[in-house]
A protein has these predicted regions:
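Eukaryotic scaffold repeat domains enriched in small/polar residues
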Residues: 20-362
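Bacterial N-terminal signal peptides that target proteins for export
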Residues: 1-8
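Bacterial N-terminal signal peptides
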Residues: 10-18
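Sequence-pattern detector for short linear motifs
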Residues: 8-9, 198
């Protein structure tokens, strides 16, 4: 009798949800970049704004909630700063929430990371993930790099408060053997450089760059990323350029960008990423977009536009960006507290890390 009653209630709930879903379906035209009549290179895929878009609610929990008339409990992204993406997982730092979120769309769950040994995460900035799945987080208040395993359990820290003024950017070799930390410094600081550490022992190895505007020097270096050919791309934000340098000698190999509001220029460069072909992606908080350059520094295209309403592809305060294994671009906006996802035209909507179906929760 109880099983029959449960089945009836579940059927009623399913019909109710199906009706709501049918009412919510709205057909929208594809948002493409670059726009017609150009050949599409990227398609807007989705916007992530809260945990309910990731977490899979169990059938029992859904039934219980409907029976008592409760709304589903979800939480927003806070003030996202940076992110990394690997194997269907989004690792995102929430600078005001003092935590790192693992948005696991494959498992359908969200993990919060707050504890860091004897410390608590305070001001998480850049996030990176090694091939082994270890999570690296720069904390601007603790002034160290925090390392966690794939489950979010604390492993160790790298660096100390006396070694940095304002650590912001982070790059990690695939095997975790070297960790690069961009120290943004400040107006009165001379620490405008990249500090390099042994990723296994935590030993400080050497520094790259100094304060200035000459090749190989930096003014407010922020986000950094390693390129497929083993070079280091540095967002030299105060000099309004991206410098590609040798990660051992610090010598400049090439540079791209200049100050300005036109395409190919930078006004407030923020997040930086690189794809498998060596193309450099740079988000700009003033321009409200991500510009894509080839490895020679030539502008290829841009994705997104500045807009004061939260529509797909509109950004008012873009920050961190990342690429997944399929070439999808994940772009944070701090003002709208969202992540917009764009897929390459060569990748289907539900291919790779977006493959369906996701597992059901019992």
């Amino acid at each position: 009798m109880l099983n029959v009653k449960k089945a009836v209630l579940m059927l009623s709930a399913a019909m109710l949800l199906q009706g709501c879903a049918q009412q919510a379906v709205v057909e929208v035209a594809d948002i493409v970049y670059p726009p017609a009549p150009n050949e599409p290179r990227f398609y807007y895929q989705e916007t992530i704004m809260h945990s309910g878009q990731i977490e899979i609610e169990s059938e029992d929990r859904m039934l219980q909630r409907i029976l008592v008339g409760q709304n589903r409990t979800v939480f927003g992204l806070g003030k996202p700063f940076d992110l990394a993406v690997k194997n269907g997982r989004i690792y995102m730092s929430d600078s005001t929430g003092q935590k790192v979120l693992i948005l696991d769309r494959v498992a359908g769950k969200v993990i919060e990371i707050r504890d860091a040994g004897f410390d608590q995460i305070s001001a998480p900035f850049a996030v990176k993930v090694s091939d082994a799945g270890d999570i690296y987080v720069v904390d601007g208040t603790l002034k160290k790099v925090l390392v966690f395993d794939e489950n979010g359990d604390f492993i160790k820290s790298i660096g100390s408060s006396d070694m940095f003024d304002k650590p912001t950017g982070l790059a990690v070799t695939a095997d975790g053997s070297k960790v690069y930390v961009a120290d943004t410094g400040g107006v009165s600081s001379q620490r405008h450089h990249v500090r390099v550490f042994n990723g296994h022992t935590g030993e400080h190895l050497y520094d790259l760059g100094s304060r200035g505007k000459e090749p190989g020097q930096f003014n407010l270096p922020k986000n950094i990323v390693l390129t497929p050919d083993g070079l280091l791309a540095v967002n030299d934000s105060g000099n309004f350029r991206i410098q590609i340098i040798d990660p051992i000698t610090g010598d400049e190999v090439r540079t791209m960008g200049s100050i300005g509001m036109s395409f190919g220029q930078f006004a407030r460069p923020k997040g930086i990423a690189v794809d498998v072909d060596g193309n450099i992606y740079v988000a700009d908080a003033q321009l409200g977009n991500t510009q894509i350059f080839n490895k020679e520094g030539q502008l290829l295209m841009h994705i997104g536009q500045r807009g004061d309403n939260n529509r797909p592809g509109n950004f008012l305060l873009p920050a961190g960006i990342a690429l997944d294994e399929d070439g999808r671009l994940y772009m944070i906006d701090q003002f709208f507290a969202k992540i917009d996802v764009f897929r390459p035209a060569s990748v289907g909507k539900y291919e790779g890390s977006f493959a369906l179906p996701r597992p059901k929760q019992k």
